[in-house]
Design a protein with these regions (language model features):
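Phosphate-handling catalytic interfaces
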Residues: 149-178, 182, 338-365
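C-terminal, non-catalytic extensions of nucleic-acid polymerases
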Residues: 2-17, 21, 30-31, 203, ...
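Residue-level detection of beta-strand-connecting loop/turn positions
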Residues: 1-8, 131-133, 157, 326-327
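Conserved catalytic core of two-metal-ion nucleotidyltransferases
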Residues: 104-148, 291-340
Length: 480
């Protein structure tokens, strides 16, 4: 009976449990040799993709790009090894052309059961071969004008997306707790490394740059400022379907951080920026218009303009900006994602990473539009928030997951009915006009021109789609 020492047995098994990761790695090495098709065989397919990417200067993003960026700074902190299957995620202005060409090259090289088709997320595509568990390539469509604006660095002929841009993709995952966290431990580690080696060092330089320089204050009329404040007090406050981001959210966090001379870091809000669930988007826009029509503090003859914009990449969805007499008042962003928030004074404010993601997105959009003034303002805000967060955590002796204004990895998010990417994929497949792209070379080799026929990419340029102008309370309506 002495052998059945329950405590001792449990301690022994705990020691085994600590070795599980190493045992799994050993099993994976054996699997790569024994399971068909073998790792050695399939690695040849990624060589074909790699050569294609180099030849056509496609832009690699994701884990591989982050790993190479980290390698430049610290080889010991890289997370991929030679035993990992190459993970080629790349942006393309012509994904259909690339998929057909790569698929045909794989067939020519002797690979069987090659398939290229649309993935779960809109504007994303994947290539597989021989029923192998890993994708050969994952391709994301980016409109050509924006594509050539994405910053990169080059190693061995491959264009990798730069950390400044890559951090937005990582923050997108950190702010999607319901459907984006299945590999959260990896993504958080990647965010940490990018911040350590790139974001924080740059923040230090920016803080020096703006230390003695006060940004030009935005000009605004008193009645416009009062109107914004009234919208926040009368409509935004206590509204469970709205999350504030942008200027007002930035000012809230800066105030709560209590950093030295924090009042000097506050900015004059350009407009109210908020995010609302997609099913309430149109109704909310109508309610804002009705409210502004009744504005008693505005000038007698009001010109209210609603400018609608397409989604911008995967960074934010469709939006509408409402202005009065040429002055911005509010911009409303739609979302289908359950986004995390915190509540201050009965107003939902985006979490730290959600606000940072929004500011990075707007900064990139400003750089594309060559709006250098706004680009500098967003740069200034990002640096201040980064500094405010770290100073707050250090002063309060927090690690970051506690309930504070700068809390990370918050699970609570806006929305009650959440649908997965697979749900939206099924809806797209059921659509009449576009059932999704699919190409199977074994059914007959096709050219890119044949496969692109009648296929249209969704518009995610972030460009203006139309204006609706209401003059003097419905006196005239003009649509452009």
């Amino acid at each position: 009976m002495d052998y059945l020492d329950i405590k001792g047995i449990n301690e022994r098994k705990l020691k085994v449990q600590k070795q599980i990761d190493k045992i799994k790695e050993k099993a994976e090495r054996v699997q790569n040799i024994k399971i068909q098709p073998t790792f050695k065989h399939m690695i040849k397919s990624t060589d074909i993709v790699k050569k294609y990417i180099i030849k056509h200067k496609r832009k690699v993003f994701g884990g591989m790009a982050i790993n190479e960026a980290i390698r430049k700074k610290s080889k010991k902190d890289t997370f991929y090894t030679k035993e990992d299957f190459p993970d080629f995620d790349f942006y393309s202005p012509e994904p259909i052309t690339d998929m057909v060409n790569i698929s045909n090259l794989l067939v020519q090289a002797g690979f069987k059961n090659v398939s290229a088709k649309e993935a779960f997320h809109p504007n994303t595509y994947k290539i597989k071969a021989e029923n192998y568990s890993n994708e050969i390539a994952d391709i994301s469509y980016v409109w050509s004008y924006i594509y050539y604006k994405i910053p990169t660095f080059v190693i061995n002929g491959i264009h990798f997306v730069s950390p400044k841009y890559q951090i937005m993709d990582v923050y997108r995952i950190l702010t999607n707790p319901m459907t984006g966290w299945h590999k959260i431990e990896k993504q958080y580690n990647r965010a940490r490394l990018l911040e350590q080696f790139y974001i924080l060092p740059e923040t230090k330089q920016l803080l020096k740059k703006y230390k003695s320089k006060i940004l030009d204050k935005r000009n605004t009329f008193k009645y416009v400022t009062t109107l914004k404040e009234k919208i926040i007090n009368d409509i935004v406050e206590n509204n469970k379907d709205i999350i504030l981001v942008g200027d007002y959210a930035y000012n809230t966090l800066i105030k709560m951080s209590k950093i030295n001379s924090y009042s000097k870091k506050l900015i004059i809000p350009d407009e109210i920026s908020l995010i609302i669930k997609e099913n309430n988007y149109d109704k909310f826009i109508d309610s804002i218009i009705k409210y502004m029509k009744k504005c008693k503090i505005c000038t007698n003859k009001k010109k209210i303009k609603i400018t609608k914009f397409s989604p911008f990449l995967e960074l934010y969805d469709k939006s509408a900006r409402i202005s009065i007499n040429g002055h911005y008042v509010i911009r409303i962003y739609s979302t289908e994602i359950c986004l995390p928030y915190q509540v201050f004074d009965n107003i939902k404010i985006g979490t730290y990473h959600l606000i940072m993601l929004f500011l990075y997105s707007r900064k990139f959009r400003s750089s594309i539009a060559k709006n250098y003034k706004n680009n500098s303002i967003y740069e200034y805000m990002l640096a201040n928030l980064e500094y405010a967060r770290e100073r707050y955590f250090k002063k309060k002796s927090k690690i970051g997951i506690e309930r504070t204004p700068f809390r990370e990895l918050q699970v609570e998010c806006m929305g009650t009915e959440i649908f997965t990417p697979f749900h939206y994929y099924v809806l797209r497949k059921q659509g009449v006009k576009n059932r999704g792209f699919e190409y199977f070379p074994k059914r007959g080799i096709k050219t890119p021109a044949e496969m692109k026929k009648n296929y249209f990419y969704p518009n995610r340029s972030g460009n203006k789609e139309k204006d609706e102008i209401i003059i003097n309370n419905n006196e005239t309506v003009i649509k452009k």
